């Protein structure tokens, strides 16, 4: 079992990565003893893992569950209220703990519920998708979507522990695994050139779910994110680099309807647009754009935005992006493989040229 620490002073917490960790009561015991436990999961994950995790936790306290519909389109205030209603109807107090058992949607909603309920109760992340294991479960970003924008209603709120059981990936649909790889590849582009090269060399091992390759890839992503979050918890500086591909990607998700494009698929196409924007600005050359496209394609990810989206549909969503300052769209762009920066002086005419030519 691999352990990584997210260093945030009194809010520090461990990430555990390994096989069969959902049956590891010893690791969970210190976070659950004598507490009331409410597991939040969805209709897809519940038949696979809910009974297993309930049995693991049963010796620590009273365990109940809330099962939500599965999909990004249900990450909203109405379904957040379902969690609050369960907590209130069953008289959960401040000594309770919420457990997020699922992917990024479940993790984001459960964390936000924990941040809000009685002004804050403990929560635990048990991510079951690759995307949530390498990205959304770590760092304390919690939120729900609004029809006018993704993740616009939320809070920074850290979990007590992140428990990553790599065996969950064996029940993950291939499309969901590919979507997670978009976030994995992002880390190589924006932070670690050696890791990007390793990904290029290990496509087959990852696609066949080789145990060692999975643990290394997930661990490296979590190490990078833990490092970044420890430096900049609330995204005032370097943490913004983790949004590579996301400004374009969130626009795709919002325009196409949440759930029609998976988050990772939108990030993949958005990452290519970011790379093409960087090339248009003279920050990188065509060879880097090609390497990025080839690696994304190797994992069966989309590298073009939907044909139905034009510049106007992109720009209306990008103007609502959370990174906008003083009315200026701020983009995370690669400056090399392994490096990125935030740029606020990208003109709309440049963006229009890139989007029209993509």
UniProtKB/Swiss-Prot annotation:
Location relative to the cell: Cytoplasm
Main location: cytoplasm
Annotated Gene3D superfamilies: 3.40.50.1970, Dehydroquinate synthase-like - alpha domain (1.20.1090.10)
Cellular-component GO terms for this entry: cytoplasm
Pathway participation: Metabolic intermediate biosynthesis; chorismate biosynthesis; chorismate from D-erythrose 4-phosphate and phosphoenolpyruvate: step 2/7
Enzyme Commission code: 4.2.3.4
Pfam families reported in the protein's UniProt record: DHQ_synthase, DHQS_C
Binding site for Zn(2+): 183, 246, 263
Biological process annotations from GO: amino acid biosynthetic process; aromatic amino acid family biosynthetic process; chorismate biosynthetic process
Enzyme class, broadest EC rank: lyase
Cofactor note: Binds 1 divalent metal cation per subunit. Can use either Co(2+) or Zn(2+).
InterPro entries assigned to the protein according to its UniProt record, in alphabetical order: Dehydroquinate_synthase, DHQ_synth_AroB, DHQ_synth_fam, DHQS/DOIS_N, DHQS_C
Binding residues annotated for NAD(+), in chain numbering: 70-75, 104-108, 128-129, 141, 150, 168-171
HAMAP family given in the database record: DHQ_synthase
NCBIfam families linked: aroB
Family statement drawn from the similarity comment of this UniProt entry: Belongs to the sugar phosphate cyclases superfamily. Dehydroquinate synthase family.
Entry function: Catalyzes the conversion of 3-deoxy-D-arabino-heptulosonate 7-phosphate (DAHP) to dehydroquinate (DHQ).
Protein name: 3-dehydroquinate synthase
Annotated gene: aroB
